[in-house]
């Protein structure tokens, strides 16, 4: 192990785990799912984030409240960070460099909290490498919990002795140095767009995270993944890493602790269900791009026209549409109202995905989004934007459970015609039937409670095995 001597012995005493996810709801939610699972098993969690983000989280189930302590730490004021911004959803991505500074400004408060609460473990996110020396000063071991699969880590952090050069072609192409064959890659425009997206035009600053420290200085490396999804990638990572690599499973909807009765009685769900009940089985395409992805007007327009041209029934969750900033094509909702719904507030996604009328999904390929959709056996039409989303899209294509909308190699633009063709291919065309069958088979794996309960138990066993007795 890195700089602490872990005992390597099993210990059945309840754990106390401090969690420090990044200031993004797409990171906070999967951390909170782990927190609830730990609490359900009788362990204690101190969950740390900003006040606004904690208020945005789902309520802790009543029976778990004694086990989960939510700690609100106010962010310091940072020049150029908009007033009230506490999450990536509050700002354009080019302002993330200032959100990072605010996050790092929590170090004193986190240090004080760890000293007084003395947890057995700190589970930290990629952006919280700064917590490692703090925790180790109190003899508390650290586990990095990566909410994305192993292929992201392996692809973007290749061994230096395996890279012939660091040209754009070398960085973006399929890794030739792996002991197995893969076709996954990123496109040059995707890499350049991601790089440019980190720069604040006003100050010239970029968001730069010490990923090497976050990955290499932990005592356990935890990932939201499974061998069934990426066994080769996990084997490679485990064989080339100096600390134990532990998949925690996919945390699929069947494992999540939710208030089902409250969801069933939600008025929005009742209205949506009434509409879905009128649709034919496996006929509706569910379209959702998460709460944080900000489409350009050009992309939104082409996407809407493509959905219309497909002539498929659809449910489009478009919560982050800002009236007056982004607009659907004139007359779109009127022309499609007989076969589709544009839902502009929060949508009960899991309830919708479980309905028999859903025949497939269109997704940006965020990890959580993919897991939820494939869990229900749905084929995916992908339109990724961020680098991790692009890789996940290519992995799913490689496994033949998804098809990506064709895009220009120059700038990533796409056409309404290609959107329509891709949707029809995946959802209704005979040529796409193999994809649909493959997705159903993968859904059986993703939804297996027996399988994922074992991953959870192995994860907890690892925390028990490598805890430090004096930290309890």
Swiss-Prot record:
Binding, UDP-beta-L-rhamnose: 291, 347, 364, 368-369, 372
Pfam entry (one): UDPGT
Catalytic residues in the record: 27, 125
EC number(s) stated in the UniProt entry for this protein: 2.4.1.273
Catalytically driven reaction(s): soyasaponin III + UDP-beta-L-rhamnose = soyasaponin I + UDP + H(+)
UniProt xrefs under InterPro entries: UDP-glycosyltransf_plant, UDP_glucos_trans
Residues where an anthocyanidin binds: 27
Keywords, comma-separated and alphabetical: Glycosyltransferase, Transferase
GO molecular function terms noted in the UniProt entry: soyasaponin III rhamnosyltransferase activity; UDP-glucosyltransferase activity
Keyword Signal in annotation: no
Main function: Glycosyltransferase that transfers a rhamnosyl group from UDP-rhamnose to soyasaponin III in the biosynthetic pathway for soyasaponins.
Family label: Belongs to the UDP-glycosyltransferase family.
Protein name, as recorded: Soyasaponin III rhamnosyltransferase
Organism: Glycine max (Soybean)
Name of the gene this protein is made from: GmSGT3
